[in-house]
UniProtKB/Swiss-Prot annotation:
Gene3D superfamilies with a match to the protein in the record: Leucine Aminopeptidase, subunit E, domain 1, Zn peptidases
Annotated localization: Cytoplasm
Lineage: Bacteria, Bacillati, Actinomycetota, Actinomycetes, Mycobacteriales
Catalytic activity entry: Release of an N-terminal amino acid, Xaa-|-Yaa-, in which Xaa is preferably Leu, but may be other amino acids including Pro although not Arg or Lys, and Yaa may be Pro. Amino acid amides and methyl esters are also readily hydrolyzed, but rates on arylamides are exceedingly low; Release of an N-terminal amino acid, preferentially leucine, but not glutamic or aspartic acids
Name this protein carries in UniProt: Probable cytosol aminopeptidase
Described purpose of this protein according to its UniProt entry: Presumably involved in the processing and regular turnover of intracellular proteins. Catalyzes the removal of unsubstituted N-terminal amino acids from various peptides.
NCBIfam families per UniProt: PRK00913.1-2 (NF002073)
Cofactor binding notes: Binds 2 manganese ions per subunit.
Keywords: Aminopeptidase, Cytoplasm, Hydrolase, Manganese, Metal-binding, Protease
UniProt KW Protease keyword: yes
Length: 519
């Protein structure tokens, strides 16, 4: 799986010993942990190597720890130091802190440390690391994910004046004695590459990624991994009655699209008849001005990320095909550009959604739920066992949960399952309720529903309640609002860069894996 406009993804290799040749220009990444406790023992805080044996000699470890003492290193989480170690055949050693020692490490602790190390590599092209040999389930794949995601960069639109002078990280070699290390590292690399694909799509500016172009890229990616692909243009959408998608897109000179990507994985299952079917839906607003209900200018440029849900869904279904998950996965991706013009929908207009429900548009900036409603109804026609929808849907998500925590709504049991898995993979989704009384706030005087309520509170939940009206009764579903988490407007941290994050790609794929394993 590759993205068309992204930078190179490093290759991954596994070794059981430190190579003696060909690593003279490599950086060796070594995890360290904190020692000492000023308050309790009076011992000076310090750092010791956490994972190096049997790959490094006792002399090399002692030299690293002596260098750390000279730098007053504490081993705090994400703390990095660069050392020259004469007894090793590499150009330098980069230590990264894990915090206090543990008997086992969580995957996300390793993933974050690997990401912090990757961001500190500078112009290094090749790295070797012992991070993957830390004790704990899933750390091998996590180390690879962190290194690839932490080294991610997007320079497709930089000229020679500002483009990076180096080629970026080219090769990663992990040192580990773990069983099935190659399989786990390959899995981690595939997941990280899918996240990078989603990031590339979101980071591509709307001048270059409009509805027809996003549909084209989805088609190219889908066909490259064997997906069935269907693309509906504006004429087909009008004819089939996709009123929400047509209504949102009618203000733009670049008309809407609907993309369907299908992975027939049930044929790979031991019992194909019992294999589950999962629908994915992702909001694809390639740019959102707000329409006639126009947004403030100050932060409008961030709306290049308003197709973050679509990007994650496209990357996820492609990954399901690449890794041959034994379940059916069908992605439905509505794509539009929300622009003000003489042809744009107006506040007060009534749309007929796909399936027949009428909606009064009280605010044209609540457009995401309109295109999602069409897509959800279409997705439910496939009779899925589960439906996962994700979108950069409401600013209220960031008010309630901040910029890093997605809100997860939907059927109670499945919502909790999705949120728990999201927390396990480090994307930290949080379960939220959908109170029945909020539906009363969506009453319209002229249509079946209004697209917004007249209240200031619970905006994230109101949007979820609106979407629930379009989900078939027999379908377990989850709605993941990633308005903040899909795009990092602050500084880079861990394995998360400034700009597109790829959230919630890892959550959705982990849920698919869980369904494939457990139904």
């Amino acid at each position: 799986m590759t993205a068309e406009s992204g930078d190179q993804i490093p290759t991954v290799h596994v070794a059981t010993s430190l190579p003696k040749r060909g690593v003279s220009s490599s950086v060796l990444i070594v995890p360290v942990v904190s020692t000492g406790d000023d308050e309790q023992s009076g011992e000076r805080p310090g750092a010791v190597v956490a994972s190096a044996e049997p790959f490094l000699s006792a002399d090399a470890i002692a030299e690293i720890e002596a260098g750390l003492r000279a730098l007053d290193a504490t081993g705090a989480s994400d703390q990095v130091h660069r050392l020259v170690v004469s007894s090793l055949p590499v150009s330098s050693v980069l230590t990264v802190g894990l915090g206090k020692p543990r008997y086992e490490w969580t995957p996300d602790a390793v993933r974050r440390a690997a990401g912090a190390a990757a961001r500190a590599l500078g112009t290094a092209k090749t790295v070797v690391t012992t991070l993957a040999d830390l004790p704990g389930d899933g750390v091998c794949a996590a180390a690879i994910e962190g290194l690839i995601l932490g080294s991610y960069r997007f320079s497709a639109f930089r000229s020679a004046k500002t483009a990076p002078k180096d080629a970026g990280l080219h090769k990663v070699t992990v040192l580990t004695t773990a069983k099935d290390a190659r399989k786990h590292c390959a899995h981690g690399a595939a997941v990280a590459t899918a996240v990078a694909t989603a990031r590339d799509l979101v980071n591509t500016p709307p001048s270059h990624l409009y509805p027809a172009e996003l549909a084209r890229r989805a088609k190219v990616l889908g066909e490259s991994v064997g997906l069935e692909v269907q693309v509906l243009d504006e004429k087909a959408l009008q004819k089939a009655g996709y009123g929400g998608l047509v209504g949102v897109g009618q203000g733009s000179s670049r008309p809407p699209r609907l993309v369907r990507l299908t992975h027939r994985g049930s044929r790979l299952a031991k019992n194909p008849r019992r294999a589950k079917k999962v629908a994915l839906v992702g909001k694809g607003v390639t740019f959102d001005t707000g329409g006639i209900s126009i947004k403030p200018a100050a932060s409008m440029h961030y709306m290049t990320s308003d197709m973050g849900g679509a990007a994650a869904v496209i990357a996820t279904v492609a990954l399901a095909a690449q890794l041959e998950l034994p379940i059916d996965v069908i992605a439905t991706v509505p794509i539009a550009e929300n622009m003000p013009s003489a042809t744009a929908q107006r506040p007060g207009d009534v749309l007929t959604q796909y399936g027949g429900t009428t909606v009064e548009v009280l605010n044209t900036d609540a457009e995401g739920r309109l295109i999602l409603a069409d897509a959800i109804v279409r997705a439910c026609e496939d009779n899925p066992d589960y439906l996962i929808e994700t979108s950069t849907l409401t600013g209220a998500q960031t008010v309630a949960l901040g910029a890093r925590i997605p809100g997860v709504m939907g059927s109670d049991e499945f919502r909790d399952r999705v949120a728990a898995i999201s927390q396990q993979v480090g994307e930290n989704g949080w379960p939220m309720p959908l109170p029945d009384e909020l539906k009363d706030d969506l009453k319209s005087t002229v249509a079946d529903l209004a697209n917004v309520s007249g209240q200031r509170f619970a905006g994230m939940l109101v949007a979820g309640v609106f979407l629930r009206e379009f989900v078939a009764d027999a379908v377990d579903w989850a709605h993941i609002d990633v308005a903040g988490p899909a795009y990092n407007t602050g500084s880079a941290w861990g394995y998360t860069p400034k700009g597109a994050t790829g959230v919630p790609t890892r959550t959705m794929f982990a849920v698919l894996e869980d369904i494939a394993a457990n139904g």
